[in-house]
């Protein structure tokens, strides 16, 4: 799915100021992926992006998921794409649709977010 990934992340005082500014600032364009699985009830969306340890920071985790419905997605879909066999190649192709500035900002955002998470 295409999303503005930073819009699904809560800003928290424990985060560095730079990360909080990026969350509130310009859109971080991303092509986020989750699993679609067929269960007895039909097709469901499964997204295991955020660990339960992020609950206290306000992240949308799936701790209470019982296995009979969609999980909470890490970001709000703006555009959905069909399932593909080679996900890595597909994502690489999608990323080429972003401007160089969008790709650079996206990379900086995910690096900054990951660096903060590694301190937790």
Predicted segments — roles?
Residues 4-120:
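His-Asp-centered catalytic microenvironments across diverse enzyme cores
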């Amino acid at each position: 799915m295409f999303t503005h990934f930073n819009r699904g992340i809560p800003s928290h005082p424990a985060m560095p100021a730079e990360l909080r500014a990026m969350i509130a600032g310009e859109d971080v364009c991303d092509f986020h992926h989750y699993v679609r699985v067929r269960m007895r009830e039909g097709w469901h969306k499964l997204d295991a992006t955020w660990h339960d340890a992020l609950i206290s920071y306000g992240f949308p985790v799936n701790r209470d998921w019982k296995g009979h419905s969609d999980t909470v997605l890490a970001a709000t879909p703006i555009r959905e794409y069909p399932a593909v066999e080679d996900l890595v190649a597909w994502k690489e192709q999608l990323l080429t649709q972003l401007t160089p500035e969008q790709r650079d900002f996206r990379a900086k955002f995910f690096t900054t977010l990951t660096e903060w998470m590694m301190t937790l």
